[in-house]
Amino acid sequence: MKKIIWASIVVVTSLCVNVSAQIIQGYVRNKWAQPIPNASLQFTSLSSGKTFTARTDANGFYQLNLPFFEKESENRSFLVFDVFPNPFSRETNFIVYALRSVRATVSIINRNGQIVRILYNAPLSEGYNYITWDGLDEKGAEMPEGMYIMQITSGKTTVAKKVLRLTNAPSSGTVAGNLDPEVLLETVVATYQVTVEAPGYKKYQNPKFIPQGKSTHHWVLFKEDTLPFRTVDHYLAIRKADNTYEPIFINGICLGISTPGTNPGNLAATKEEYRRWLTLIWEAGFNSIRTYTLHYPRFYEVLDEFNREHFERPLWLMQGVWLDEELSSPNLYESSALFDSAIAEVLDCMHGNRVIGERQGRAFGTYNLDVSDWIMGYIIGREVYPDEIIYTDSLMLHQNPNLTFYNGKFFSIDSASPSEVWWARRLDFFMDYQKSRYNKSVPLSQSSWPTLDPLTHPSEPPYPISSEDWTQVDLSKLKVVAPNGGYFASYHAYPYYPDFINDDSLYRTFSDSYGPNSYLGYLTTLKNYYGKKPLLLGEYGVPSSWGNAHYAHSGMHHGGHTEKQQGIYNIRLIKNIHQTRCAGGYLFALMDEWFKTMWYTNPIGSTYARRSLWWNVVSAEENFGFISFQTDTPNFKIWPELSVNCWIDKAKFSYDPAFFYIQLKLKRDINSNDSIWVAIDTYDRFLGESTAKNGFKLDSRSEFLLNINTTRPLLYITESYDTYGIYHGYSEPTQKYRSTITDGEPWNVVRYTNGWKEYIDIDSVGVLNFYLYSNPLDTPTSKDAVFFKNKEILVRIPWTYLNVVDPSNQEVLDDDRGTKERETRITDGFQVQIFDNWKLCSRSTEKRMLWPRWDKAWPYNERLKESYFILKNSYPNLDLKPF
């Protein structure tokens, strides 16, 4: 669904339906899903102070009549929120909150009062209903610009909202920060404080409960337990009803939530989005979620709500405490006070005991709901860089040569480096704060990665050629002094990085049922080093990007995978994690995140401020999720149609936040002897190459040349504009990184480098994937650039392949290699010429095609990738139980 700005609310009064009060019922259970009889429940209205009570029967069941509205006169059947975006060009949304299931009809009416489209004619579901209009009429024809009415009718009640359709309406972004539809819902419905109590259990208090029109609500009570989870030989374990501990293999997922148009500090998700995402995670078969930092209170409220409703199989939380990267000094000791303060803040928030004032870039609010019982452990910190460790160790040893041990209240360490001592102190502070303030302890770790592992890697070049095996942090020496949840090692370990995972001869001897697997060798060796200490993969996974930033011995590369391959490889990885007796792993990640950057695409990428406004399908780091974000179908009417008038009939063009599109209509089927050439001039008609690869003279000098055929479609770039080797600094002198005037100079297939000077690897992205509809053995993939279907060809080219630095800003690469800066230029639009290998066709667009810039993310839909369904269908068949 789309992110919605809830600008206003219309209250609809039903004349015939009494929904002022509803029956609320459910069960009160403990964490082992056992019923709790004779538990008392109290619902106190936050506005009137009126209290409603109930008690559970022998089966833990309760029931009571609870008003949904404060006053009997306020009987309502549904609530209508405003239309968004408005004005719109592609899609707009009508949002209805139904207090009960009632039949409704949603219509689009033009300015003449004619109904041009019935969008919806069915019962509304209880809760939120999202109804989208794509600007088309009942027959699928595009409606002209102008004012329209979106109208909902249910029984005798009708509500209408005006909406303006413009062909080039300004892009509408997403709502950020702490605005949530439930904030508006609270203004019109009753809100309660809920207290649930039973002898022998902790009192449960929910300070702000909204029934939401649902009739069933379950509650979970926990025993007073100082050690609900602990580490037990290789695994984290949960206390059972008989006070023994049962090991858990963690099959978790990392909860990144940076939707298009947002950055991590926004934490912009609404309650409704959290509910949907947790449901997807749960239905896929995951048992835990990991957060890196503190979220807004609404996330923890939804987590508690979700786990109460799924008490037989809850989603356990692995909560993080972030260590700032923007530190004043690389000396870790100078960040101690700030980091300890962050630890205390997170612990207080998890126990419902902190109010944080408004601040920029971080979550804030009133944390008054105790969710600590849903937390199985904490991972604090981040991937610390080798230079930070080297700097800290050298400086602190110089100041204090005896800084090699620490004897704390809960942890101690000997024969340690100052950095290891620093981590031991932070872990000890964490455990002491939690134990002294809240009389509780759960397993604890700090984030690490292979770059700092305690192993020696003979294949890795020494510093300064490489810093990947330069230093280490070894907390296997950490000892438990006083009873607590224990320590477990946590690594972000992927199958393609660093190089030693692929190159060490020992690791390369390993294989699994899929084939050679040096990653399995690395995990086996690392786990053997830690012995019985639990080793958890805090991150693992492969992305479904078009570009491949790093090759892997196992074939599980840093990108270059289809969504299907992504799913298969992620199943392979969790199998590897399980068979090496690791404690489990957290798949990275829930969703694609457009804000992310990486070295592979950085030299021709947009600035941080604008990166989240468009989708770079080439970048591996943007495409790790199993949720993708798609805008509506490209509009091929925004630019004039090009009549080629030969066996190639017509050409149309379009764009979206990810691709530039070319649609060709043919008068006959393309055959194996045909080649269609498309010359693309991306900026400045006076720059570029004048001659195509086949010797054909171009109408307009161009930077790119696309060869469409049914055996090997290729995308070429002029030698001058070629960026091959740009990141590593070993491009040829003839590569200017800008378009120049050339006549008969070479055309190169678009390629990227994903290795170092000494280890050059080539990613030939210009060799385009294609789908041939007439081939019964062919199936479309998420990486296909060319689609052949009957007498139609659709081409989609990622912006990055065309050296478009930032499509949202109309910005293309136009560099001066003589400066340190990377120069760009605002394009004057694309000009395209189409011709064939028979030289029977040749036609160019008359005008340059320039798309409007946008400053906010386009409205989008969430789409589950093919990889999600592979995971969901595979997990039940995997025996992911602790050994």
Predicted regions located by residue number:
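Glycine-centered coil/turn sites that cap beta-strands in beta-rich domains
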Residues: 68-84, 88-110, 130
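N-terminal carbohydrate-binding accessory modules
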Residues: 222-280
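Glycoside hydrolase catalytic-domain groove-lining segments
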Residues: 466-553
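Short, surface-exposed loop/turn motifs with a glycine/proline- and acidic-biased composition
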Residues: 121-156, 170-173
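Acidic/polar low-complexity flexible segments
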Residues: 681-703, 790, 803-883
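Aromatic-rich peripheral "rim/lid" segments of glycoside hydrolase catalytic domains that contact
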Residues: 552-555, 576-652, 864, 868-874
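Surface-exposed, glycine/proline- and aromatic-rich loop segments on solvent-exposed faces
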Residues: 644-753, 813-839
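Short, acidic Ser/Thr/Gly-rich low-complexity loop/linker segments typical of extracellular
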Residues: 47-67, 172-179
